[in-house]
Amino acid sequence: TILAKNCSCTYKGVKINIVDTPGHADFGGEVERVLKMVNGVLLLVDAAEGCMPQTRFVLQKALQQNLSLVVAINKIDRPDARIKEVIDEVLYLLMDLGATDEQLDCPMLFCCGRDGTASLDPDVPGTDLVPLFDTLLSTIKPPEGDPEAPFQMLVSSVDYNDFVGRIGIGRIQNGVAKVGEE
């Protein structure tokens, strides 16, 4: 990922916005811009490869902003998965980056993205993504803002679509966007 990508889904009546950020320090400006748009971080770590150098950079920025953290150890189905070692790698990295006790006590899930499953226990295979979404809802605080205040939005990127026209992508700070507003 060079530029952040975003999507959203609705789970239990809550809209969850997901932003995939570049992981490399060379794209630090993009990472910092994106982290201003989110309330928490889902750190995805490969069960075989473990923490990558770019993991350190993005995680450090997220911890500095005191964002809520959920760790997902992915690809646990790989024959070369090192789940317990990767858990230790993540914890050592968090400690090395000066994580608070609350950040160190973050929930960890064990996932197989290919199969669309997540589990809270590495020894119990997941059957769906319900544990992941439930954990996101219980761990990451909803955005703060006043829906009655005038509309304010922190625009992080601008795009263009032939059908819709100019599109501003960002985080609503206050107010509500209404259809037909300019």
Predicted segments, located by residue:
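Structural and coupling elements of P-loop NTPases
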Residues: 1-182
